[in-house]
Amino acid sequence: MNMEDKAGSYAIVIKALSKTFGTQMALRQLDLTVSWGDFLVIFGPNGAGKTTLVKILSTITSPTSGQVSIAGFDLKADYSSIRRNIGVVSHQPLLYQDLSVIENLRFHGRMFSVASLENRIKEVADLVGIQSILDRKTNILSHGTQKRVSIARAILHDPPIMLLDEPETGLDQEAVSVLSNAINQSERGQRTVLMVTHSLERGWALGDRIAILARGNIVYENTTTSLDQSALIETYNNLMGRL
């Protein structure tokens, strides 16, 4: 699927999105658009709503109110089409611990009817550096290695959109480079990425657009070409000091 074939100008459209848990409002009338091919990094402190946002976009959690469109599909109406168009890497790997690495990948691949599955597994395993551990049980792997497996699983069905929730947690610098390479290699062309993180330095280095989320809403947006890393850190600290 080429960029020009994709429905509309935006990969993700969020309008007036709110999410409450009891009396606590995690997201407040949030508006956001992500264009095809963007790498948007969202920063924010603990409790800002970052993980809640990714869970909603990943169809794990339902919004309380608002509208969300992903790859042209309405979140409330077409979960299955959205899931085919997204790959998710969370801060916890969320793998089947009683299965081997290759069994985890096969399960995911069959769920999405991945063509030439064994060849595709070899491709992604080579890409993220797990080709030597495919037969090992997941539960004996380190957190960082499990994270590599979760990256392989997320890109296995070659989704055009990646959703990353603190993906660098538990990864060394080499693995962060693997993550960056993996999410940017797609058979369909350039991937669209939405990543949430607390790491200003790594987020700035990876993204081309940045946003700051605080108290459940976007309070700042810019591009990494318009704002260098030191200016981002200063802007973030100033905003956090006022909120």
Where are these regions (language model features)?
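Catalytic Walker B motif of ABC-type/P-loop ATPase nucleotide-binding domains
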Residues: M162-D165
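Helix-to-loop junction immediately C-terminal to a conserved catalytic motif
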Residues: S58
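Conserved ABC transporter NBD signature motif
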Residues: G66-D74, I82, Y220
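The feature captures the beta-strand-to-loop junction immediately N-terminal to the Walker
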Residues: F43-P45
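Conserved ABC ATPase signature
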Residues: K137-L141
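Conserved ABC ATPase "signature" region
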Residues: R106, R110, S116-I133
